[in-house]
Amino acid sequence: MDPLCTASSGPRKKRPRQVGASMASPPHDIKFQNLVLFILEKKMGTTRRNFLMELARRKGFRVENELSDSVTHIVAENNSGSEVLEWLQVQNIRASSQLELLDVSWLIESMGAGKPVEITGKHQLVVRTDYSATPNPGFQKTPPLAVKKISQYACQRKTTLNNYNHIFTDAFEILAENSEFKENEVSYVTFMRAASVLKSLPFTIISMKDTEGIPCLGDKVKCIIEEIIEDGESSEVKAVLNDERYQSFKLFTSVFGVGLKTSEKWFRMGFRSLSKIMSDKTLKFTKMQKAGFLYYEDLVSCVTRAEAEAVGVLVKEAVWAFLPDAFVTMTGGFRRGKKIGHDVDFLITSPGSAEDEEQLLPKVINLWEKKGLLLYYDLVESTFEKFKLPSRQVDTLDHFQKCFLILKLHHQRVDSSKSNQQEGKTWKAIRVDLVMCPYENRAFALLGWTGSRQFERDIRRYATHERKMMLDNHALYDKTKRVFLKAESEEEIFAHLGLDYIEPWERNA
């Protein structure tokens, strides 16, 4: 039996040829006459489908609004081959063996290349062996969705907070952190890429066979996975957790303002506890470190979403008091859907004058100081140059004006039932980062400050290695055409890169 044919219990009604848009003259020149595409709306949504249809037509592809006899390729997103066939069956349509069922990644790659790319296994949608009454031995069972479509780049994978492989990703994140403490960049990247790709899997790794074909899993990584499968833990991770240097660095860097160099210094001096450090009269602390110690208990505890939203109200009230047309967007982990975090980041931009933008953060700081809400601040002035090429580094910071603060958040702002008359401390110290960017750079800044860190590293790496472009928080530059590519939204940046758009909550790589 043809694997792309659905079982029919009775005579099939002849499908009428669709008319209307599919028969109308195309609005764009068709470059590839032998390909006729139909983009399935199921699980994709009308807006995204219309966007992809228009983009594909502009690239010279023939795309039908309705499914017709002339269609040669059905393109779907987040659907298996079986789901597409089930949809066709509901429509009373029998799929020909000549009809290609493809993942949207094929269309994205083709548009990026400016021509149809070769169809490989990673593009083809897989049909379950148990789909029809007569199983076809030519089709393999799962993990179809897993291995066949996984990219080495996090920007081509959807990674939600539903992590099915915590036992492995937790281990690799500990090893990555230890590598970072030792300033071993190669090991850090190896472990972070492994953790990132495992987070994106829609199934749990239960045997080494499940790792076949998954990128970013080298021999060392696979040895650790195998040990965890067999023993329930990794001896290397266990050794790291018991390592005095790791424990000390973990403790020291938990203090706001303390980095690797200071941690190394304190460790070499023999310090192993914060109490000994704070009581040592010979040590000198920066203004940031003093604030870090002073509000340590608050800052080391997690910020809840309710607290983050309450801070958001504070920020918007202050910003809009001076710049009513400003856009204030919460970024970072909270924009990606996380329920807790260590700080709250906000991106601020305005279509108004540059002079108003430059003066905003000092005015906001002054306002909070007068209200008694400002516990600490560090204002970093902008060094942004409009026509400077994006950085070649995948981990570089941007040059926008920014302010790192610690704000006093009263409990009553989070929970109105809590009275100001309550005993004890009535507020919590919260770390807040404010970033002010020019209006025309807002899309790039939003993409960069949303994260995750691994997602941003990979989308910049992808731009460089796959598209011959340079991307950072400021701009996107096409090295081939030698032009800056403008973007009004994150969606447009993805489109420039030939990437399928990934929502913020799917960037938890």
From Swiss-Prot:
CC cofactor: Mg(2+)
Ranges spanned by the short sequence motif Nuclear localization signal, renumbered to the chain: 11-17
Gene3D superfamilies attached to this UniProt entry: 5' to 3' exonuclease, C-terminal subdomain (1.10.150.20), Beta Polymerase, domain 2 (3.30.460.10), BRCT domain (3.40.50.10190), DNA polymerase beta, N-terminal domain-like (1.10.150.110), DNA polymerase, thumb domain (3.30.210.10)
Disulfide-bond pairs as recorded: none
Free-text comment on the cofactor: Can also utilize other divalent cations, such as Mn(2+) and Co(2+) (in vitro).
One term of GO molecular function: DNA binding
Residue span of region Involved in DNA binding: 258-262
Region Disordered: start-end pairs: 1-25
Keyword Cell wall biogenesis/degradation: no
EC number from the UniProt entry: 2.7.7.31
Signal peptide: none
Cellular compartments per GO CC: cytosol; nucleoplasm; nucleus
BP GO terms, sorted: DNA metabolic process; DNA modification; double-strand break repair via nonhomologous end joining
Binding site for Mg(2+): 343, 345, 433
Protein family per UniProt: Belongs to the DNA polymerase type-X family.
Subunit relationships: Interacts with PRP19 and DNTTIP1. Forms a ternary complex with DNTTIP2 and core histone. Released from this complex by PCNA. Interacts with TRERF1.
Function description: Template-independent DNA polymerase which catalyzes the random addition of deoxynucleoside 5'-triphosphate to the 3'-end of a DNA initiator. One of the in vivo functions of this enzyme is the addition of nucleotides at the junction (N region) of rearranged Ig heavy chain and T-cell receptor gene segments during the maturation of B- and T-cells.
Protein name, entry field: DNA nucleotidylexotransferase
Annotated organism of origin: Bos taurus (Bovine)
